Amino acid sequence: MQSFSISNNASISSYAYPKTASWKIRGESSDCCLWDGVECDEDTGYVIGLDLGGSSLHGSINSTSSLFQLVHLRRLNLGGNDFNYSQVPSRIALLSSLTYLNLSNSMFYGEIPLEITELSHLTSLDLGRNVDSSARNLLELGSFDLRRLAQNFTGLEQLDLSSVNISSTVPDALANLSSLTFLNLEDCNLQGLIPSSFGDLTKLGYLNLGHNNFSGQVPLSLANLTQLEVLSLSQNSFISPGLSWLGNLNKIRALHLSDINLVGEIPLSLRNMTRISQLHLSNNRLTGKIPLWISNLTQLTLVHLRHNELQGPIPESMSKLVNLEELKLEYNHLSGTIEFSMFASLKHLTMLQIRRNNLTVLTNISDNTTLPKFKYLALGDCNLSEFPDFLRSQDELIYLHLGRNRIQGQIPKWLGDIGHKTLSILILRNNLFSGFEQSWELSLLTKLQWLELDSNKLEGQLPIPPPSLIGYSISNNSLTGEILPSLCNLRSLGFLDLSYNKLSGMFPNCLGDFSDSLLVLNLSNNFFHGRIPQAFRDESNLRMIDLSHNQLEGQLPRSLTNCRMMEILDLSYNRISDKFPFWLANLPELQVLILRSNQFFGSIKSPGAMLEFRKLQIIDLSYNNFTGILPSEFFQTLRSMRFSDLKEFTYMQTIHTFQLPVYSRDFTYRYEINLANKGVYMKYWQIPNVIAAIDLSSNAFQGDIPQSIGTLEKVNALNLSNNHLSGDIPSVLGNLANLESLDLSQNMLSGEIPQYLTQLTFLAYFNVSHNQLEGPIPQGKQFNTFDNSSYEGNSGLYMKHLPKKSECSEPPQHPNLPKHQGFNNILPKDIEWIAVVIGYGSGLVVGVVVGLRVSARIPEWFVKTFGRTQGNRRRREVRGVRR
């Protein structure tokens, strides 16, 4: 092992230590059988065991390694190291006596060599969890497929291929491994049906098929696996699986059935599992009440029922589950009033999450009642009106969520006293807090990483949190004054949202200084003035900048080109005076550009070769002073709008995952959008990644509408209103198959409305008023739904027949959006609409306002910046089932 370097960051285990370092201390002349991790045969002296798991090794295993001379080796453990994306060496086949091989969690990359099948004596093979920090599976099965594995390893008792990219169905032949007691195929991109032959693996005590793409029904033959103690089928696409067969598995200790499309009530068959310790049923569609019989499962330590549709009260009988450590009931429809003292008997309870229900929680606890020491406590949306006094004794809190209540008054000083050692995440948003008792300073919370104080009644200067902070959101308060220089001491800051306050002064230069860590910067809706400084450094990781609704002026800083990861840039409603920033095309990830309502001027025709905006989907240049023609090549640069690809539906957002003790927590910063759609100004709380919109309204563009617009088939909304455009309406606009809103009003367009536009079957809003159009108004399909106001101010237009209500008054469903999620209907049911009727020509208002949203799907790594908390170690936390 002399070719390896020793790195403290080469293993994620807290128990790792460099075993090979002791070999040098003992000296090469010493007996190697006495070295750490080495086992020798007592009779022959041959090395038969080598355990270098978690030994902080970094490097690769080359073909000349002395490792392959240990031909008598029976057990080899190299798991938990960093082999730096090297391949599993094919010469490992020389170790033909191996019965145990562990190469897990060690950054091996590429296809598993076929030669490994020559190790026919193996009883345990672990190649699992070779993933990087972005959750990418590094190993592939390749020609070493499951069928060949089943043929060559007939003596296998333990097999772990978790996070190996297999990408196939599971062959029936796998059931030939009849000696298996442990099988982990989690996160292998498996698909199709689970073979019924799995029921023949009757010795299995551990079976993990989670995080795959299995479909259909779960085979009833799994009822034969009566030795199972751990079963995970989570995160698959089963069709309403029936679970009556679970009643046979009375040895189960851990059951993971989250996110598998379960419907109906919590299965009655679970009540036979009297040994069960962990019950995971989250992210399904379970209804009804929490059954009373669940309190008879007295061995339970974890109950996860979050994200379902459960109703009724939390049964008081759950207080009998005296071994309970984690209880997650958030995001259901639970109701009623509960006394918090009901949890006093659960002395081991460290995690309680009951937010986002319809509960009223009474937190007055008598002096002689002793509550458990919580580490994770989520009481959001629990109708609290005062800060819970019982928290005074909760000095082990890591995560505290009291958001969306009605808590008044000041944030108590004792919170700083009890939280200074452990509190990492504090969420107090959407309350009525007016300040901090005795002006105590947030810097007391020295471990704090995430802080949300949005939507309260805080006044005065911006509170400065401790340097440990990664996310800080204090939007929608009444803070005043300038940003203090001490804010720039937050060198780890990744998310900063100070929007919707009354802050003033110059844009702080230092915010650009730590843009290598900063991902989201939102200073919108304040009173900042002056120039945006040339402060954005090389290697910036900024994804989103929102400086809209301020009083900023001058030119755009060219240092923005350093923000190569930028996705959203919103500078609307300022006083910026500059030419069109063609150079922003150098930002390869830019998706949304909002320059609305500034003092930009001149032509948008590039003086040189036009660079491509490769990913731009929303561009708003409205209400500026742009002049000249609309250059054809400008629209040709909008590459991502030219193709209507059916990519996976998501929302534009940035996610950060905290790896906390016991579990991880995702925080999603989801971008929002303001639209004037169908003449109504609305706020959309989420931006689907399939939306494309162009707004060039209220400028002084002239000349013809370029034919090249007709190639932008992905565009949903096009607004060219209130300019000086002339000539005909090009019939190629009929090629915009996804168009839902078209506004050409307040121009000097002439000629007829092309009949070809009737092919736009998604068109829900059409306005050509106040032009010089003539001839018949097209009839049929969506054109039968537009009223006269769409055409007024064109004296030469006429209708052959009066418009009447059509059966297609609602546009067909857009193919790129989920059902009931058209461009005009992407709002969740429970959010507020902001609607103001606007006049003609006022345009499509596309403005990005960023809102903070929190989710807790566990765990999903995303931000590489924070995935490497120590050195350059590349890893993803294991998301698997606890053994």
Language-model segment annotations:
Residues 1-883:
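Plant-biased, solvent-exposed loop and capping regions
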